[in-house]
Structures are given as C-alpha cells and as structure tokens.
Amino acid sequence: MRRALIILLVVVSPVFAQVRKLHTRDFTRLSQVQVGEALKQTDVIFIPVGAVETNGIQPSNRDYTWPLAYAKLMAEETGGLYMPGLMWSYPGTTSLAPSSIYSTPQAGTAFLKELAHSLLRQGFRRQVYISASHGPAPLTVGTLVREFFEETRVPILYINMDTYLPRLQLTAEQRSRTIYGAHSIAGHIEDLPLRGDYGAKESEPAGAIPANDGLTALGRLGFSGSLTLGSWVPDVMSHGGDRDLPATSAERAAWAKLGEEQLRAIIKKMRMPEAMDALRKHDRYTQELIVPKFFTKKP
C-alpha cells in the first residue's frame, strides 16, 4: 500500500508543480522556471531601442526611457514579456555632445540581430522593437527587421512611435505629460529636473547661435531630417530642452501620474492584442504559403 502511494505521488506531483507567479514582465528579472512557463503561454516579447544623447537639462537617456515604458505597457496589455534592448543606438545630430554616446547604425543593427536570433532560438517568435522620440532609429531598426526576415523568413515588427502616434489623432493635452509617465514607469522619475535645479545660464546655449540659412531653407522645402540629410546641432544645449518644469517634487509626481494615464490610454488605442494576433497570422501565411512556393532549402 505504501509503495503504491509513493508511485502515485511521483506520477501526480508534476501536475501540481509549483511555479512562482510572474512578479514582473521584465524577462531579465524572471527565473529560468518562470521564463519556461511564460513561453508555454506566449511567444511575444517587446524590445525598446533608443539613444543616450544630449537633451539639454533633461536626462540623456530620455529617448530610451520612453520606448522602455511603451514596451512594459505593451507587455502588460498583451500578456507578453519585455526586456532591455539597445540603449546606445546612433544618436544622429547630437553626436558632438559630451553626453552623447556614438555608435553607428550598422553596429546597432548587428547587435539587435544577434539578440533577435537568440530570442527566436529561445522561443520568442513574435518580437516587437519600439522607438520613440528618436529620429535616426529607423536606420538601425528598419534595417534589422528586413535583414532578419530575409535570413530567417520570420516576420518581426518595428513600431516607430514618432510616425505611429499621428494615426491616433491625439490632442496635445492627451500626450502632454507622457515623458513624466514614462520615467515614472521606468522608475526614474527623479531624473527629471525641477524648476530651479539649473540656472538660466546653464539651461541655454553658451552664446548666440548664427542662423543656418541653408538648413532652414531645406527644412522649409521638406528636405531635412535624420534620415535624409547630414547635420549637427550647433550647440550641445540646443537639442531636447524643456522649459516647462514642475515647481516641486509633488507637482512632478502629479505630472507623472497623469502621464502614466495618458500612456495607458495610448496603448489601449493601439489595440496591441489584435496586432499580435495579426502578426501570428501573417507569420503562418508566410510559412504555409509563400515559403513552400519559393524555397526548397531551410534558412
């Protein structure tokens, strides 16, 4: 009788295996056991891409923190995971500044491609890369998704929030405090300065900046931008500054609360669960119809 009971317990115990519930959707903070369990439910993962560059008196990693917050909220909305991605992508016009980390678009693409191949091997087939408030990002991430598809025949997705957000037709008020919400979600709210943290002299360019009439004219004609023309900022303080600052830490916290609400509303409007289902269907169509028709060898 005792032997039969032991055998029964051995057979039944795997059914009642105890696994800690997800305490976060950050892939890097989960255990091997948790990741394995998560992969039984989803193959979706979100990866932010940004830059560390001068933003005047604002944090130099601002344009990474924004997509990081989007990635976290998208993971929550879809039941997927998210993870740190590429913080050091090509900065573009700000590369001359002491706080700007320079890396070529090709180096960024190569790094992300290694990451994408690893994630695919691990079981994350639906990968979503996100950038926000960073004009040169498509040079890195757009190349990634196309080259990765040609190499693996697996479609991964790039969401450029700068070009996507206009589709939602948001008012300025509906996105007025998202930068504060993003830093709060990322746990970096104290990085955003308060009014009076910097003096007037330290908040402005070192002196008068002569007008670049040629660049101004090209912009007016529609022939400028990070993807179309080489240029640098004329002063390290002339990029990304914000004079609308909270007066107190309490006001900053209130702006952060509002910003989080705005970001969550944006994610709802994006209909990410529907998008992830569509990505799965597109992948299946590719594998079942297009690949057999045009390829005889595995990638």
Give the positions of each predicted feature:
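Positively charged n-region of N-terminal signal peptides that target proteins for export
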Residues: M1-A4
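Hydrophobic h-region of N-terminal signal peptides that target proteins for export
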Residues: L8-A17
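Extended, histidine- and acidic-residue-enriched regions that form the cofactor-binding/catalytic faces
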Residues: Q18-G80, P84-G92, P98-Y102, A110-V128, ...
